[in-house]
Amino acid sequence: MWKEAAAEALPEVEFRAPVDATALAEAERRLGRGLPAQLTALLMETNGMVGEYGTDVVWSLDRIVEQNLLFWSPGTFPGLYMPFDPLLFFGDNGGGDQFAFVLTPERPDIFVWDHEDDSRLWAARELEDYLHRSLAGSGDWYR
């Protein structure tokens, strides 16, 4: 389902080998929280997606874990940004802005974090909507 949705928006989208349940369980253990169901389903089909110009529209599971652990660490950006704890980052636009699920309160919407002004803006209704918008759009499609 996820590969088909992505290829519909951008036939040249690149896929990776899927992750297995063991890798997902280990990732959730390291993160200390569960992954959103839509993201889990996508990762079980493909371990990330690469769009035009090598943009990591959906990161690999390893990158999701590493980036979120970094952003959730209290010493990473002390006093520079609002807390990232409610967010789970999973992709970017290739220019520094990152896309995330909101974990607290849990909702299916995708938000974008602007690294220049620390704003967090709504970008898509859910993951499939995000894939269509990000893969078919150009530039800063979410603005």
State what each model feature region is:
Residues 108-109, 120:
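Long, low-complexity acidic/proline-rich regions
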Residues 100-103, 122-124:
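Short conserved micro-motifs at the rims of enzyme active sites and ligand-binding pockets
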Residues 85, 107-108:
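Sequence-level motif detector for i,i+2 pairs with an aromatic at +2
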Residues 1-98, 141-143:
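A surface-exposed partner-binding patch
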Residues 104-107, 127-129:
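A short, sequence-level motif marking secondary-structure junctions
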Residues 118-142:
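Compact, glycine/acidic-enriched structural inserts
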Residues 91-95, 104-105, 115-117:
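Short, flexible beta-strand-to-coil junctions
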